[in-house]
Amino acid sequence: MSMTPREIVHELNRHIVGQEDAKRAVAIALRNRWRRMQLPAELRAEVTPKNILMIGPTGVGKTEIARRLARLANAPFIKVEATKFTEVGYVGRDVESIIRDLADAAVKMMREQEIQRVRHRAEDAAEDRILDALLPPARQGFGDEPIAREDSNTRQLFRKRLREGQLDDKEIDIEITETPSGVEIMAPPGMEEMTSQLQNLFSSMGKGRKKTHKLKVKDALKLVRDEEAARLVNEEELKARALESVEQNGIVFIDEIDKVAKRANVGGADVSREGVQRDLLPLIEGCTVNTKLGMVKTDHILFIASGAFHLAKPSDLVPELQGRLPIRVELKALTPEDFERILTEPHASLTEQYRELLKTEGLNIQFAADGIKRIAEIAWQVNEKTENIGARRLHTLLERLLEEVSFSAGDLAADHSGQPIVIDAAYVNNHLGELAQDEDLSRYIL
């Protein structure tokens, strides 16, 4: 990952509108990882990531920034809710399961990459197995060279027909390695590790057993291709690489961190919120967690915590946790101009998604500039009057706005015969105007 912070921000701008401070902070954090890897080994071990605390209302892009960052870095990533965890001793998940889940995500990511790498070899091997089932090898006989050549020519002809899909519906008998059926084990919260070990034990029983199936060629080809790809992947090497990737590149996003802050002057039931924070301390500071991959050191995993902090303040977190989240970034609430940009600027924007979805039914819709402006204004107004859910309000508005069009898309396509339906300000006011003005209606519908 050798992108500069400026390039990282430019890439994030393709998907997220505004929030420049947050983008700069995560871009620097990601670049510092690359810088650290260029250092001598002795100094590299001493440089730890500067963890980030994002503060801002819901729906402004906190989670999306972290998710896009992980995709850019091609790094193991996991998003967790702080409220799902409890202090050790209470019923609920303990915080170490975060690292176990991150390790599972790393293995899955590495396996997908490795399967992609060996895909062509797996396809060739799968083709050969299918051809063996279609054309059993000729018996060896005296002076069989011409037969072998003829067999080779026939095989190439069948290979060509196979690749062109002419044999897809032909049925063959083929031997497939059976996948052990998984055993679902219900266990109380906090015992995930034991459950995982039991599931692994049961799934290993009967592993490698083969069975002959009668399948169509196109179905058999997919199964055999997956089997050959799995055979070409070196599991031990894959796990070693996944372990290194978790330790050096892992990113953990902890949402709703404000919900485990103990608010000042608030009494009542409290299932040890402060205890969850104290359990998070060693994880963020650096400790060793036992996982299926082995012992994972968390010293160089990047932690990004986020919260709205409506009721609590960042200073309500325990001081030790505040110290372990040194970079503070405040994300701003969205303005009508931001909503307007969200509807048009990002790659695969909402308006583009709806346009392409309806195009599949032959219906052409166009969003006029004044229509987009009016949608943005209504989204902002409803957020101000009711709960502020940020950009998520646009999903609700657009679903409501295009409900009739989506329901009757096939009929409308026939009626308009290629002419576009224009979503302008008048159309928006006609479908959303009254709902936006009536606070009681907008509270329940928008």
Swiss-Prot record:
GO terms of molecular function: ATP binding; ATP hydrolysis activity; peptidase activity; proteasome-activating activity
Gene3D superfamilies linked to this entry: 1.10.8.60, DNA helicase RuvA subunit, C-terminal domain, P-loop containing nucleotide triphosphate hydrolases
Annotated binding of ATP, by residue: V17, G59, V60, G61, K62, T63, E64, D255, E320, R392
GO biological process: protein unfolding; proteolysis involved in protein catabolic process
Primary location group: cytoplasm
Keyword Hydrolase found: no
Keywords: ATP-binding, Chaperone, Cytoplasm, Nucleotide-binding, Stress response
Compartment(s) of residence: Cytoplasm
SMART domains: AAA, ClpB_D2-small
Cellular component, GO annotation: HslUV protease complex
UniProt similarity note: Belongs to the ClpX chaperone family. HslU subfamily.
Complex and partners: A double ring-shaped homohexamer of HslV is capped on each side by a ring-shaped HslU homohexamer. The assembly of the HslU/HslV complex is dependent on binding of ATP.
Family annotation (PANTHER family): ATP-DEPENDENT CLP PROTEASE ATP-BINDING SUBUNIT CLPX-LIKE, MITOCHONDRIAL-RELATED (PTHR48102), ATP-DEPENDENT PROTEASE ATPASE SUBUNIT HSLU (PTHR48102:SF3)
Stated role: ATPase subunit of a proteasome-like degradation complex; this subunit has chaperone activity. The binding of ATP and its subsequent hydrolysis by HslU are essential for unfolding of protein substrates subsequently hydrolyzed by HslV. HslU recognizes the N-terminal part of its protein substrates and unfolds these before they are guided to HslV for hydrolysis.
Identification of the protein by name: ATP-dependent protease ATPase subunit HslU
Organism taxonomic ancestry: Bacteria, Pseudomonadati, Pseudomonadota, Gammaproteobacteria, Pseudomonadales
Gene it is expressed from: hslU
